Every structure is written in structure tokens, then in C-alpha cells.
């Protein structure tokens, strides 16, 4: 029995072992099969497709470079896409003769990268007919290929012909090239191929931008798009060229699903050409100086990253306290395409106000998704940046901040929200500081030892210090942006100044000196020319440091000009320009955004802080702003006491009046002068009265007690007095917050408005009372005897009061005012008070009735008038209070205005003046 049990147990054990072995073997085979298979394709909805060459043949058969136009064109209308993309066109379609570009430089030939000269990259795309070649079309593609998506001028000539059909010609800038030794040779486009619009660059998850750029720099234009696939495993590179990987294709010649890595463009795709984008939250972000391989970051300091600045690898001053993200939108996982979408994308498309029927607020009709995928418009929604002028008809096509955000939350702390939103762009407060360096100056008047320009950056002291260089960042300058809708706004900018040499060609046309000629003027046998060293090397150490390598004397300028003249360049001279670069990213919120009213509303406000353009002025030439930037005159270029060149903001030049910051000096001096003269006159007059009273005491006059002021008269008088005094005080805080910084500006604005409302209501009720009661008559001068009695009253104040003489006019309940008082109140109540109310109301209502306020001149006119009248009211109060002391006793009139009862002098001749009885 036991043996049978043992045998059965052994059998079960063996069976279990066999089953486990089978499972293990099967599992191992399954695991092996899983390892052999690649992960799921990135885009399961995108079908597999063959790679086709320019002739439409499969590249596996031809071994030729891939044609994106043919490959992607199997399903998508690539001709439509390429012709509807300013990224591809780059200004080719707007190309014209030099100097004919609207608001461009004298030598610009288009408004895009192909034809618009950039002093940072310097090289000039030579137009046909120019005597000197700087950069031909092939040179342009080799030099700037890292920022060229292909198509447009990379495939098409300036006359619209395919580049590959042009015959090599050393005399044409479209079919020649300038060699390193300065010689010019023909370029054969049929051999190099052209660079089609590279769909892979934006629509693959891992495009090899470096390999593509290297192919373009080598002149292998036809293979550039193929090189973009280097990291996908579809193609490999060897010394003999590029080879297609047959294992990446199925038996029918189409890509295997796992190699179809097509996707919507991501931030990383955009970053290849634009600027620094960091998406890996686990890896600290680093950056190096003003790296021009990230042009947007180098020119603006903008970094697209959701990482907290404190967690980055950048060496920033007080970094530990910077708990904010580099960019709040990147932190919230927004992509570039969420704002810069295809204009016909059915999810985002919005019709222009000029074409949408006026009765429609929203048009629900959209492209079918299939129609959109076949013909997506690659003209992307864009903003109004100052530096990018290509395709101006597409500016302001993107949704802005207000499309997604409401300003309601600002109402809890920001007065005049609508007015602020009208004058200020959102970025003005929400991009208060950039924490990456940016280019400040590019100086091509001198050259570094490697033949490059001298560049200085703002926000860091060591632009060549690597990733450990200490960075402070910088505060952008606010300038008035001319918006497409005609409503200008203050917006943040970085300003890059540039100096360079220009010359006159044989036709008298101005051109920038070609780089090769500039280098030939500066160097001999790879070293600085001896005659230049004799002038520049002040310490005679055989090298040029940064204090020597600068055009800061007439002798240096003349020496370089002579060397350029020797190169055959006519009339070489230095010119300078300033290019504003718009800043729209690196947005922050909450405590990191500007929330302090006095950031703008004071003399030394950040709004008025100058931005340095250069530490000195190369060649003594003051630069001017480029003409094609969408900015209005809102500042001046000035030289500081330290010799540096600055841009000094002055928003008032563009019609912006900022309380507490802007004021008209002569208005203040005039008002203050009148006030002080009155105060001095009162002091002198009162002192003489006191002195004469001590010498000749005035005999006590006969008095009678009269109920002079009713309760309401006293109420409105004291209420008006308190309101006016507090209005003057709060107005002074608003006008000069720098002098009274202990008071909260926002609360003073609110209190000023409330007091103005009280004054207005009180004045209206007082007018109603005086009209209905008939008391208004005492304020109206009567012609009969008015001037004679006015003279008598003036004589009393100027002479007789010092003798102790009685008042010439008897004061009664029905006639409280003497002729001079009537005249004063006539102007006060009929001119000054209405003027102050009207100007104040228009200033308050500038956001409710901007058109009406604009018809009155806007704040630049209303505020100074309001200020001057306020000075006159302050002057009136001083005179008025003093004159109340001229009664029988010093406090008689004031007591009367408190109790209503007044002791008045008895005049025996009162009946002779019935008009004042």
C-alpha cells in the first residue's frame, strides 16, 4: 500500500516537473519571440508606406536619396503644403531688387531668411549683378542650413525655375560658390541635388538634425533629407555614402510598422531650429552662454522648459529661491502647436473678422478631417514678433493670452483693469525677468583671432565660461508695440545692437563688406595685420585683449578703413543698428509676476530703467533702430556718464501717460510757483497785520449776532472742504508716489475716486439747494457799482486793513460775499470746478469711454490740466483760509461756519449800498 502510494507520488512529481519544463521552454520561446519583435509603432493610425525617390521609384531599387515630396505625396498634397509654408518659402516669393523691400535695409532683397541680412550671422546673400560675391544660394544653404526646412529657395531659383535645371555658371550667384581661398567656381545643382521640404524634420520622433545639417554643410543637398533618418535605423552611413537598410522594409518595399515613427510635431522638433527646449524633467537643464545654435534663446533669453529653475543645472544667482518654472505653459504640458497651429486645422481654425459674416460670432463649419490631412496648411498661426518679418499678412493669426485666460482675477487687486489690458501686453507683467543670457551687442567693426565678430551678452559676465558660468539674467525693456489691430501696447523686448562696415559698390549702392574681404583686411598669414597691431596693441604684448580690440579712436577707425580701401572697397564706413527682439515666452504667474503698482507708477520704475546697448560706441557711430520692427517711438538712445550706450524708455513719446511716472515739469513748477507766491503773500500780509495790530491796536467795532449759515450750508461746506483737501493729498500721492511711498498707491487711487464721487454728489446737491432757495443770487455779481466796490474792497485788503479800518461792505445772511469774493467764486464754480470735474471724469472713464477721452487729447492732455487745476485749488484754500481771519476776530468766520452764528460789524452806511444789503 505504501509502495503503491510512493510510486503514484513519484509519477505525479515527474509529471509536474515535465509540465514545468514545458512551461519554461514555451515561456522562453515566447520571450525570445517577444524580444525579436519590436515595440508597437509610434503612430498606430498611420499606414505603412514605401520610401520613394524623386522619380517615384522605391529607394530599395534605385538606391537614390528619398524624396519627401514623392514619399509623403502619395497621400498628402505636398505641393500644396510646400506652397503654403512660410517656413519653406523664407522670403523667396517676396524677393525683389536690393533696397525695394518695404522698410528694409538698403541692401535687403526680401523680408525672410532668404534675402534679409542679419548682422548676427552677417553673411549677405548676393543679388544678381553685384560686383562682389559674399554668399551664393549654395553658400546660403551650406551656412544657414541648420535653420532651413527645405523647399522654397533650397529647390527653386529666384526666377521660379528648379535649381537642378540650372546650368553651372561661375558668374551667377545662383550657380556659383565662393571657395575658402576666395576664388569663385561654378556650382552644379544637378550633381549636388536640391533640399526638398523635409517632412521628417518635424514629423519624426527622432530626426537626426545634426546629420542633416552636416550633409547640407558638405553640399550634399539631395541627401540631406535622407540624413534626417540616420537615427531611425532605416538608413546607415558609411564612407561610401548612405545605404538603405532592407530589413526595415517588408517584402513589398514598404516600411515595417515599427519603423513608422510619424507623429505630430513636438516641442523638441521645433527646438531644432528655434531655441532651447528641455522636456526631460529628470535631467537638470543646462545651457552655455549665448549659444547661437539656439537662436531664439541666444537673442531673447527664452528657454522652453517646465522644470523648476531651482532644480536646473544652470548656475544662476540665488537659484535656490527660484521655485518657479522656466515657462509656466511648458510646465502645464502645452506644446508649441497648441498656439502655433496650422491655420486650417479644424480643431483650432478661426476665421478672420474681415471675411466672417458680421452676423456670426462663431462659424461651426470646418474642414473634414480627411480633407485636412490631405492638405494641411503649413502656414502656422503666428504672433507679431519684431524680428520676424516674413509673411506679414499672417501676423496676429494666433490666439493670444486673452483667448484662454480671463482678466477677472486681476480685478481683486488691480484698478482700471481694462485700461491696463489696453496699454500693457500680458507679457509686460508676466515675463518680468529672463534667467538666461542673451546677446547684447554684435561688433563686426573688429574681428576676433578666429575671424568672428566680438559679441557681448547681457545677463552673464562670462559668455565663454561654459555651463558653470554665473548667470544673473536680465530684465527686458518695455517698448510700444504697433499691433495689427491699430491698438499699440507696451511689450517686453531684448535689444541687440550691431556695428559693421559698409561700402559703396561701382553703382553707388551701399552694401555690407563681404566677410572674406573683412577678414582679408584684418589678417595676414593667419595673424592680425602688423599695421593694425601697431594701432590696436596699446600695451605691446603682441595680443589684443577686449579693451584693445575695439574701435574707440579715430586712429583705429582710419587704420581699418585704409585696409578695406586697399581691398578695393570704396568709401568704407561704420554703421550701427538696433534690432528689437520680442519676448513672449517664459511666462510666469502669481508672486513671480509683477503685481506692485509702483513697479510702474513712480519715477525710478522698472518701466523707465534704461537697457544697455553697448559698453562703448564703436567708431563713435550712434546706432538707429531698424525700420521694419513693429515698434513706435517710445524712447531714446543716449550715452551715459560711464561712456556706455543705453536705450532710455520714454512711453510718453508714444502717447502713454503713466501716473506717478509721467508729468510735465513746467506744469508742476507753475502750479508750485503760484502756490508758494500765494503762501508767501499770505505770510507777508499776515505778518504786517500782526505788526500793525501791536503798534496800533484796532478799536473794538460795534457787532451784532446774525444767524448766517443754515445747517445744510455748513454741512456741504465742511464736506466739500474735507473732500477737496483729501483729494489734493491723494492726488499728490498719485502724482508723486516717489515722495510719498509709504502710502499704498492702489488704495490712494481708490480713495481718490471715492472722494471725487462724494465731491461731485455734494456739488450737485449744493447747486440744487442754491437754485431752489434763491441763494444762488449772492454768487452772481451785479454790474451796477460792482467795479467801484471791488476797488474799495481791494483797497481795504491792501491798505486800510492795516489801519484797523472796518470792512467796506456789510455782510448779511442774504449777501455774504463781497465783490472780490463773488469774482473769485465765479471763476471757481464756473471754470475751475467744472474743468476739474470734466478732466477727472474723463481720466476715470478712460477705459469706459476711450474714444471720448481720446477726443479730449487723452491722458497726456487731461492729466496735466487736472494737475494744474489741483494746484489752483490748493492755492485757493490757502487764500480762503487766510481771508477768514480778516473778520472782527481771527476765528470769527470759522466759528460761524461751525455754529451758524456770526458776529458781524454794524455799518451805518449799509443802506447806501442796497445791492449789498
Language model segments and positions:
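Membrane-embedded alpha-helical bundles that constitute the cytochrome b-like, heme-associated redox core
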Residues: 628, 634-661, 668-917
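Bacterial N-terminal signal peptides
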Residues: 11-24
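Bacterial N-terminal signal peptides that target proteins for export
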Residues: 2-14
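Exposed boundary/loop context
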Residues: 19-20, 49, 535, 724, ...
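Early compact domain cores of eukaryotic multidomain regulators
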Residues: 86-88
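Catalytic metal-binding/acid-base residues of hydrolase active sites
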Residues: 18, 432, 882
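C-type cytochrome heme-c attachment and multiheme electron-transfer modules
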Residues: 25, 29-73, 77-81, 91-696, ...
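A broad, structure-centric signal for solvent-exposed, well-ordered loop/edge residues
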Residues: 8, 58, 901-905
